Amino acid sequence: MPRAWILKSRPKGMPQPSDFELVNLPAQSLGEGQFRVANRWLSVDPYMRGRMNDVKSYVPPFALGDPMQGGAVGEVIESRNPGFAPGDTVLHMAGWRDEAVIGAEAMPQKLPALRVPEETFLHNLGLTGGTAYFGLLRTAEARQGDTVFVSAAAGAVGSAV
């Protein structure tokens, strides 16, 4: 039976273990074009704290009782999608679950076989690293010899710069 971490209550200050709950989910059959992933890595990112509040922002807040959304890396274990075969390693946004049925809405990406740990695709080779890289080189147009100041409060992206 698949399991997922849900947001049980909205944190007051620092999130506490009591704000979350590990729950059993009903088993899902695969639809055409979907595949099942056994997750090996889940991402816990700074932006998630803001989504735990019930306020309007650039992304909707997490819904109480729903599985936490976020990046994950896992292995395809069953597939009805010709682009994804059992054994493929994928990055997706189905979130904090041990197993997930993936469709296009989870934005799956098959990961290349590189000599880096696969969890690297959740940070330095993922959204955080890409934002740092393109922000520094394309937006700021930093060049060799430039001095760059990165605030101590720059968060995950700043730490990747």
Give, region by region, the residue ranges found by the protein language model.
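Glycine-rich beta-strand-centered segment in the early N-terminal region that forms part
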Residues: 26-44, 52-96
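Short polar catalytic/cofactor-binding loops
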Residues: 7-13, 42-44
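Short structural boundary motif marking the start of a folded domain
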Residues: 1-5
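Short glycine/threonine/proline-enriched tight-turn/helix- or strand-capping micro-motif at secondary-structure
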Residues: 14-26
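N-terminal Rossmann-fold NAD(P) dinucleotide-binding loop
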Residues: 158-159
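NAD(P)H dinucleotide-binding glycine-rich loop of Rossmann-like/cofactor-binding domains
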Residues: 70-75, 85-152
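Conserved hydrophobic "DFG−1" position in protein kinase catalytic cores
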Residues: 6, 27, 78, 101-102
